[in-house]
């Protein structure tokens, strides 16, 4: 019980610190399925009470659900006529650059998840 509370505290801290949006996938266990692991939507197996990172999300395996929280901030308030956003999958971030000169960054006044 202490381990689970500790894990939930860590997840809550990550969510709060990153201002992340989360989704919860309730688990439907089959009679022959192990109860000490989770199976994600891609068929990946994860040990109970563990974290992993996939597709720019942090995920956590609980006994009844998998919780995944995005860690990507999306620029929303910038000059959309003069500038465009670029996604960098290697570090799950966006940059906003000029359309005519992609080497020059544009100011961003607001971000969202």
From Swiss-Prot:
GO terms for cellular component: extracellular region. Disulfide bonds join 22-69, 38-61, 56-92, 59-68, 83-106. Keywords: Disulfide bond, Secreted, Signal. Homodimer; Interacts with PI16. Its main location: secreted. It comes from the Eukaryota. Residues 1-20 form the signal peptide. It is found in: Secreted. This is Beta-microseminoprotein. Belongs to the beta-microseminoprotein family. InterPro entries: PSP94.
């Amino acid at each position: 019980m202490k381990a689970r509370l500790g894990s939930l505290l860590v997840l809550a801290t990550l969510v709060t610190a990153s201002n992340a949006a989360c989704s919860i996938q309730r688990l439907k266990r089959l009679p022959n399925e192990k109860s000490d692991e989770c199976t994600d939507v891609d068929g990946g197996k994860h040990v109970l009470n563990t974290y992993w990172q996939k597709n720019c999300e942090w995920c956590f395996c609980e006994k009844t659900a998998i919780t995944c929280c995005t860690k990507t901030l999306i620029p929303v308030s910038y000059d959309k006529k003069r500038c465009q956003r670029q996604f960098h999958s290697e570090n799950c971030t966006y940059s906003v650059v000029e359309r005519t000169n992609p080497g020059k960054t544009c100011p961003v006044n607001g971000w969202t998840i």
